[in-house]
UniProtKB/Swiss-Prot annotation:
Lineage top rank: taxon: Bacteria
InterPro entries in UniProt: Class_I_gatase-like (IPR029062), HST_MetA (IPR005697), MetA_family (IPR033752)
Native organism: Vibrio atlanticus (strain LGP32) (Vibrio splendidus (strain Mel32))
Annotated GO CC locations: cytoplasm
Pathway: Amino-acid biosynthesis; L-methionine biosynthesis via de novo pathway; O-succinyl-L-homoserine from L-homoserine: step 1/1
Protein name, as recorded: Homoserine O-succinyltransferase
Pfam families named in the record: HTS (PF04204)
Residues given in the record as substrate binding sites: 163, 192, 249
UniProt-annotated location(s): Cytoplasm
Family: Belongs to the MetA family.
UniProt site positions, description: Important for acyl-CoA specificity: 111
EC number(s) given by UniProt: 2.3.1.46
Function: Transfers a succinyl group from succinyl-CoA to L-homoserine, forming succinyl-L-homoserine.
Length: 313
């Protein structure tokens, strides 16, 4: 089944060119199907690029998904036209009275900023707390994972000396966990962060199920036992060129970034990078939608209750 997005959203043309089935709202409104309602809180600067990346992953599912885009506040954006934000993004006040099947909170380039210094930190905490009462399952990505762990477990920020950048090998820890269904024993995924997520630290301070780790990158995937909060510390949504663009950006700003690991053929930035994580990203999002959202959410979202959810043993 397709994703349902506004007819004029720029991502529509990009995804159609990739032969991805997009159903405009004008057509979807004529079908008697209860789609999953998924909200994306987009914290990334280049919002059009980011929304397209996440919509691509959400599209590869037999479930029909109705996607709405959320902005953190009404401050002007340096990288996204105001017209785009006004036309396609909602403010929190417009959605806080509703319930949603799923919420995705994207990463943000705030790895070296203390939580209390993030200009929208209090507002983000409000949204995360709201999600616990209004959303079946929330997916926290990269920086949002660190923010979510701070809110839910009061974990302090742990920062690496050098930025972690590249494509790393990961090992799954519980092949029978629903989120990992269909995963290979090892898989590749990109990272671009300063945050440090060690398996020992999470095991000591949380009751999370640690699902996948890397010897170099640490914990990649973890979830609460009721699957209502899922944490992804990397960027499965990244396009093949995203790490390259970040590397070139940092060079242009006078920084001395390390060449992303295991990314360029022969470790040469002059070579075109290859996306070796695409199938994993699609499977991760498909499993999240199916096992964490669809199989747990009530048919009537007006009957949403925290008591509806059970924890796996």
């Amino acid at each position: 089944m397709p994703i349902r997005i506004p007819d004029q959203l720029p991502a529509s043309d990009v995804l159609r060119e990739e032969n991805i089935f997009i159903m405009p709202l004008s057509r979807a409104s004529t079908q008697e199907i209860r789609p999953l309602r998924v909200l994306i809180l987009n914290l990334m600067p280049k919002k059009i690029e980011t929304e397209t990346q996440f919509l691509r992953l959400l599209s590869n599912s037999p479930l029909q998904v109705d996607v709405e885009l959320l902005r953190i506040d009404d401050r002007p954006s340096k990288n996204t036209p105001t017209e785009h934000l006004d036309n396609f993004y909602r403010q929190f006040e417009m959605v806080k009275g509703r319930n949603f099947d799923g919420l995705i909170i994207t990463g943000a380039p705030l790895g070296l900023v203390q939580f209390e210094d993030v200009i929208y930190w209090d507002h983000l905490k409000t949204i995360m707390e709201w999600a616990n009462k209004h959303v079946t399952s929330t997916l926290y990505v990269c920086w949002a994972a660190q923010a979510g762990l701070k809110l839910l477990y009061d974990l302090p920020k742990r920062t690496r000396k050098d930025k972690l950048s590249g494509v790393y090998n990961h090992e799954i820890h519980n092949p029978y966990h629903p989120i990992l269904r269909g995963f290979d024993d090892t898989f590749l995924a990109p990272h671009s962060r300063y945050a440090d997520f060690s398996q020992e630290y999470l095991a000591e301070h949380t009751d999370l199920d640690v699902l996948a780790t890397s010897d170099v990158a640490g914990v990649y995937l973890a979830a609460t036992k009721d699957k209502r909060n899922v944490f992804v510390t990397g960027h499965p949504e990244y396009d093949a060129h995203t790490l390259h663009n970040e590397y070139i950006r940092d060079l242009g700003e006078g920084m001395e970034p390390v060449i992303p690991i295991n990314y360029y053929p022969n470790n040469n930035p002059d070579n075109k990078p290859v996306a070796s994580w695409r199938s994993h990203g699609h499977l991760l999002f498909s499993n999240w939608l199916n096992y964490c959202v669809y199989q747990q959410t009530p048919y009537d979202l007006d009957h949403f209750s925290e008591d509806n959810f059970t924890k796996d043993d």
